């Protein structure tokens, strides 16, 4: 609808009737100068495809999608790919229970420091290829609620997350027989604290993480102290404090 509207800077869609729309793929793709968009009244209740919806909106700094109804969406591939100026992203009410594809979903969101996707239901997701690749400002990523039992492609999922200090993937399962886990942690922060379940992780994943000097922690809970999420176990807390003094 607005694909490649490179001159579009502001958009207030308060009066748009989107109640019958089923496909929003590429809707704002390559709106390279879009700085502000109001989608609070968007009706997305019938939408099944949000592929590349905001891809390459390189000037967009804030996006509140908490009003979106996504309970029918199957495809979120590249949804925020290339939103390089994005600082604030509100996905609090996203229902991802039917989503099958999250490939490149947050790739190249270079200025995103924090991302709360604790509400995501990923039990039907099959692809997470490069999902967070080159999110090089992201400091903490808590994915302890992620269900990856159906995922068969994780290659490059955290590649280029060069500022990542804490990563919790202890719930990750690698059940699919031909699952691709190549280069999951390429160019990640070498002082990163990672939390995994070693008993449920393939040798390839463990070998990749052996390059990181910090102790891993399994069965880890996270707590919020002074608006910072830190691991509860003593070994991880010591590593975290040593890394932040």
Where are these regions (language model features)?
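Negatively charged
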Residues: 1-244
